From Swiss-Prot:
The keyword Membrane appears for this protein: yes
Subcellular location: Cell inner membrane
Biological role stated in the UniProt entry: Could be involved in insertion of integral membrane proteins into the membrane.
Any one Gene Ontology cellular component term annotated for this protein: plasma membrane
Keywords: Cell inner membrane, Cell membrane, Membrane
Record's bilayer topology term: Peripheral membrane protein
Pfam annotation, one family: YidD
Name of the protein described by the UniProt record: Putative membrane protein insertion efficiency factor
Length: 80
């Protein structure tokens, strides 16, 4: 499942994204963020982080530097 999600994101970046002008308000781009989030946290948590990020990518949000977190909030609850 993870490889299918990653393949889909890479396919979007290669074949669909170039058809449109650059419009992502964030650095790294939303698709790069999604790749990193799924690779780091797996399909469920990574996809959730990517969807939350996509929800913030609109003209009324200032954007800027927004990297994938090193730990998920759930991971912080389990630290000793």
């Amino acid at each position: 499942m993870k490889s299918l999600i990653l393949w889909s994101i890479k396919g979007y970046r290669r074949w669909i994204s170039p058809l449109f002008p650059p419009s992502c308000r964030f650095q790294p781009t939303c698709s790069q963020y999604a790749l990193e989030a799924v690779e780091r946290f797996g399909v469920l948590r990574g996809s959730w982080l990517a969807l939350k990020r996509l929800g913030r990518c609109h003209p009324f949000h200032p954007g800027g530097y927004d990297p994938v977190p090193h730990l998920c909030h759930h991971d912080l609850d389990n630290t000793p």
